[in-house]
């Protein structure tokens, strides 16, 4: 009723932006008259005006005032550099982001281009802007691609990548706009708060941040906190023994009901992702291990056995992890990418290593941790973009205080979503997928098949190979990851078949007919790698042979002499045509020139990538070689374009890209993301999901209704089932999962919120110390607090002064401050409590000055260094112990629900008391260490 009376709130919101859009359009003509240098000058003028204003509120008002002009400048720069003009709806998207909201824009509507608008505007403050993407590949692509606009306008652009050292990181964070992944930002924040010297801190104070694929980062990844850990020694043979034992245990066929154990040694709850031993299982384990109690604190076994069972039942090779270089490497469940260097905690990773007979790495202990929710709430300005935010609108609002606004599409969507096909068994489903893929491929349309795991993508690959359908495979396996740019470049060509694991997180548009820009880059890379790249980098040839009925994909490790041969084999698959002789000759001359100037095989693959990417930009350059490279790229691109333009027409006539989903994801949003790959910007396209009653979603969350359906359908495995009841079961299963995971995230957030206030206090204190601000006053402050605490502990104000325990008080004071050795009972006997506190504080200050003069005789400034060292040492050690105590408290506090107490309130109260105790210990330890500090002096040592 309200909606009818007031109209749609989203439409009302969009109307508000219309006058500003008109103002930007009005400015367009005026701005287009400016030369490139004048545009850059405008940027400098805006920057000096805005960054000069120090008051936060007034600066915000200035940004609002200059918004139309700034957006018009970016639009003009983008036209000149990228040949892309922001549509009116994209300008609205930019304004929504500038107001720290979430802009929901459909796939292919140019989210990446929209981000340039608010990033440019907020970078004018000089405080830095972060653009966050889900993976290194996208961060790099956006920094190279959209970064051109900012660089053209005279702003500096930084990029954070996984393998950068701290010096490179600092340089990149100091830029006006920095592109990075969510995990790199989070880990750098934690590392900065473990730094022992201010020079090790790489990040600046946070200012404004735009998150691309915001739902993926703030929702999907919010269940797992970021953790930095250190190694602790644990007996490794226990992992091996538990892994052997897990193989001897028998899984129960069903879960326990009404407290009655099922038949079997352990039950597996896939919904909760847990394994629980039955009474029979406990007895079997105790007998096998020769122990009386698996929970004996002196010789605990339960934890090892549970982890071994989880490794056996819930962590599956080529789904949750892959084996690479004799190590178990985690595969990100949302993006399908490997995460080298990441490990599961609580001994789970060690259990997997034992299961796979790999070398068991030492277990780890948490040194620092934060959830993505609390990390991103540290930004004063936070905005995000996604194709699908409405499904999670409530969560964005509640957790992050972020509104969502749906931005209308620029052109009407022409995509057709065909009805789901459900099969009784999984093998029936895969056969149907292969059949439909083959049919669409023969119609000359490109096909993208989304799978949920490495294992499933390889199963489909073998089915297509049997049908002799050439295809490309994009999953977490290293040999496929290295080909990502190449695979995506040709995914839109006529009849191309691409199998991708969780394409949803890949954020790369598939251009119908193929991407001539990427192909030109790859062609140059193919020619230059053998000449310019160091041989040890050659194990990554850029263009391995495309899969067909004979090849199993991948490539051999022996590169070198085979490299050119391999590349020439594959060229026919990748490139649309042979280059004419004039261009070939030009490329040959270019190669000679580059070898002469850049050296024979002197570059790494990344360095060559960087130079080719710079050449592909339109930003002005003084480098003669980059200009030559740019010319050649343009020639090759134009040559390919001639062929691809016909191919694009053919693909459009055939019906555009067809997307096949092979399993419903736990979240409807991820399904919509996959669908959104087809039909971008008004293109034709179609999608279909193939499902089976064995799929995880239906099996785990579908309940008994689906199990009964399975028995009711007496149909062949390759016969699709269509039923309204089944569709409803699917919908309700997805809603169930979404609610279930929302509750988990809410709980993670609520508990981390308690830690968050403590973390802010500790990290704030640490930063002050690192900067060396008033260290002496800080330590004396610790001492004064300690004196007050000693007086309060030993003197009861309700007793008369003659009954006060003055002697014990004095011995406690001397314990902390040995320089007060001559303090006597008669000195303080007649003082009131308040006078006593003041007297002891005064004595402490005198003693501290005395200590400082002793230390500074050895070396001036040594006292300040000692203060910093001891405060940091105590904060770090005690914080680490505190994190473990809080973990233990969190595990135990859940049981208090049985006693009618709210576990969260109990956790808050006890956590607060533990924190106060930690801070008290820190102050006391620092003051004690400072007075006990006796540096060794060596007469021969000038240092």
Swiss-Prot record:
Major localisation: membrane
Keyword annotations for this protein? ATP-binding, Cell inner membrane, Cell membrane, Cytoplasm, Membrane, Nucleotide-binding, Protein transport, Thylakoid, Translocase, Translocation, Transport
One GO term of the cellular component aspect?
A: cell envelope Sec protein transport complex
Q: Name one GO biological process term.
A: intracellular protein transmembrane transport
Catalyzed chemical reaction(s) = ATP + H2O + cellular proteinSide 1 = ADP + phosphate + cellular proteinSide 2
Recall the GO molecular function terms of this protein's record: ATP binding; protein-exporting ATPase activity
Compartments where found: Cell inner membrane; Cellular thylakoid membrane; Cytoplasm
InterPro entries associated with the record: Helicase_ATP-bd, P-loop_NTPase, SecA, SecA_CS, SecA_DEAD, SecA_motor_DEAD, SecA_preprotein_X-link_dom, SecA_SF2_C
Question: Where is the secretion signal located?
Answer: none
User: What Pfam family is a match, any one?
Assistant: SecA_PP_bind
Function (record text): Part of the Sec protein translocase complex. Interacts with the SecYEG preprotein conducting channel. Has a central role in coupling the hydrolysis of ATP to the transfer of proteins into and across the cell membrane, serving as an ATP-driven molecular motor driving the stepwise translocation of polypeptide chains across the membrane. Probably participates in protein translocation into and across both the cytoplasmic and thylakoid membranes in cyanobacterial cells.
Q: How does it assemble?
A: Monomer and homodimer. Part of the essential Sec protein translocation apparatus which comprises SecA, SecYEG and auxiliary proteins SecDF. Other proteins may also be involved.
Extract the PANTHER family matched here.
CHLOROPLAST PROTEIN-TRANSPORTING ATPASE, SECA INNER MEMBRANE COMPONENT OF SEC PROTEIN SECRETION SYSTEM
UniProt family annotation:
Belongs to the SecA family.
Sorted alphabetically, which HAMAP family does this protein's record hold?
SecA
Protein name according to UniProt: Protein translocase subunit SecA
Its source organism is Prochlorococcus marinus (strain AS9601)
């Amino acid at each position: 009723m309200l909606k009818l009376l007031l109209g749609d709130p989203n439409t009302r919101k969009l109307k508000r932006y219309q006058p500003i859009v008109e103002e930007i359009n009005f400015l367009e003509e005026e701005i287009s008259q400016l030369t490139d240098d004048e545009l850059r000058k405008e940027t400098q003028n805006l920057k000096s005006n805005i960054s000069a204003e120090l008051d936060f509120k007034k600066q915000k008002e200035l940004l609002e005032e200059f918004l139309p002009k700034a957006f018009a400048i970016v639009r003009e720069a983008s036209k000149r550099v990228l040949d892309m003009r922001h549509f009116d709806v994209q300008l609205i998207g930019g304004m929504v982001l500038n107001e720290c909201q979430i802009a929901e824009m459909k796939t292919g509507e140019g989210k990446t281009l929209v981000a340039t608008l608010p990033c440019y505007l907020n970078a004018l403050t000089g405080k830095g802007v972060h653009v966050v993407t889900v993976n290194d590949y996208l961060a790099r692509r956006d920094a190279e691609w959209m970064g051109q606009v900012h660089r053209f306008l005279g702003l500096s652009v930084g990029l954070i990548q996984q393998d950068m050292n701290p010096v490179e990181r600092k340089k990149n964070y100091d830029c006006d706009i920095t592109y990075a992944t969510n995990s790199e930002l989070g880990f750098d924040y934690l590392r900065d708060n473990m730094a022992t010297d201010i020079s090790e801190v790489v990040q600046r104070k946070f200012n404004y941040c735009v998150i691309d694929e915001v739902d993926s980062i703030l929702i999907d990844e919010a269940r797992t906190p970021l953790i930095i850990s250190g190694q602790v020694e644990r007996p490794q043979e226990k992992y091996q023994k538990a892994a052997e034992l897990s193989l001897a245990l028998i899984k129960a066929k069903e879960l326990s009901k009404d407290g009655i154990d099922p038949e079997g040694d352990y039950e597996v709850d896939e919904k909760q992702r847990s394994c629980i031993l039955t009474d029979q299982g406990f007895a079997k384990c105790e007998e096998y291990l020769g122990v009386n109690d698996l929970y004996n604190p002196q010789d605990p076994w339960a934890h090892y056995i549970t982890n071994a069972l989880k490794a056996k039942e819930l962590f599956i090779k080529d789904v949750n992890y892959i084996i690479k270089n004799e190590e178990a490497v985690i595969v990100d469940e949302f993006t399908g990418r490997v995460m080298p260097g990441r490990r599961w905690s609580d001994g789970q990773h060690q259990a997997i290593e034992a299961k796979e007979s790999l070398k068991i790495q030492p277990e780890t202990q948490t040194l620092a941790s934060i959830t993505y929710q609390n990390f991103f709430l540290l930004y004063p300005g936070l905005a995000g973009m996604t194709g699908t935010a409405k499904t999670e609108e409530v969560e964005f609002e509640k957790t992050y205080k972020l509104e969502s606004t749906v931005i209308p599409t620029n052109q009407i969507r022409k995509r057709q979503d065909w009805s789901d096909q459900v099969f009784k068994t999984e093998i029936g489903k895969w056969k149907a997928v292969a059949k439909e893929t083959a049919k669409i491929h023969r119609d000359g349309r490109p096909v993208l098949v989304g799978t949920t795991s490495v294992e499933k993508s390889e199963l489909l690959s073998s089915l297509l190979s049997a049908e002799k359908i050439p295809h490309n495979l994009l999953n977490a396996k290293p040999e496929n990851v290295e080909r990502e740019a190449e695979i995506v470049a040709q995914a839109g060509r006529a009849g191309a078949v691409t199998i991708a694991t969780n394409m949803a997180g890949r954020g790369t548009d598939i251009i119908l007919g193929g991407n001539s820009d990427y192909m030109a880059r790859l062609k140059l890379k193919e020619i230059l790698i053998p000449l310019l790249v160091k041989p040890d980098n050659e194990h990554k040839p850029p263009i391995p042979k495309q899969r067909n009925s004979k090849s199993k994909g991948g490539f051999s490790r022996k590169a070198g002499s085979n490299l050119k041969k391999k590349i020439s084999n594959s060229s026919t698959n990748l490139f649309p045509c042979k280059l004419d002789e004039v261009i070939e000759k030009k490329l040959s001359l270019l190669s000679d020139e580059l070898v002469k100037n850049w050296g024979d095989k002197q570059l790494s693959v990344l360095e060559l990538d960087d130079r080719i990417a710079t050449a592909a930009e339109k930003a002005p350059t003084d480098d003669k070689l980059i200009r030559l490279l740019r010319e050649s790229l343009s020639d090759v691109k134009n040559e390919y374009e001639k062929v691809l333009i016909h191919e694009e027409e053919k693909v459009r006539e055939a019906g555009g890209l067809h997307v096949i989903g092979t399993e419903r994801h736990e979240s409807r949003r991820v399904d919509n993301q996959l669908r959104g790959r087809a039909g971008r910007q008004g293109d034709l396209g179609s999608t279909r999901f193939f499902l089976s009653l064995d799929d995880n979603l239906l099996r785990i969350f579908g309940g008994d209704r689906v199990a009964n359906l399975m028995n009711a359908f007496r149909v062949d495995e390759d016969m699709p089932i269509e039923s309204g009841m089944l569709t409803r079961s699917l919908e309700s299963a997805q809603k169930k999962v979404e609610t279930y995971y929302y509750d988990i995230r809410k709980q993670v957030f609520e508990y981390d919120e308690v830690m968050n206030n403590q973390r802010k206090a500790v990290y704030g204190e640490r930063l002050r110390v690192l900067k060396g601000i008033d260290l002496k006053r800080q330590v004396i402050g610790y001492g004064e607090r300690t004196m007050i605490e000693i007086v309060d502990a030993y003197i009861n104000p309700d007793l008369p002064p003659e009954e006060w325990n003055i002697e014990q008080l004095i011995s406690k004071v001397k314990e902390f401050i040995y320089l007060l050795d001559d303090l006597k009972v008669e000195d303080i006997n007649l003082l009131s409590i308040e006078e006593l506190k003041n007297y002891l504080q005064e004595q402490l200050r005198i003693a501290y000055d005395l200590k400082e003069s002793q230390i500074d005789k050895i070396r001036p400034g040594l006292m300040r260094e000692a203060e910093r060292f001891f405060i940091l040492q105590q904060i770090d050690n005690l914080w680490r112990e505190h994190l473990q105590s809080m973990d233990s408290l969190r595990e135990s506090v859940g049981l208090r629900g049985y006693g009618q107490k709210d576990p969260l309130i109990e956790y808050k109260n006890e956590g607060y008391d533990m924190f106060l105790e930690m801070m008290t210990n820190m102050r006391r330890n620092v003051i004690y260490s400072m007075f006990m500090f006796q540096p060794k002096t060596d007469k021969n040592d000038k240092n």
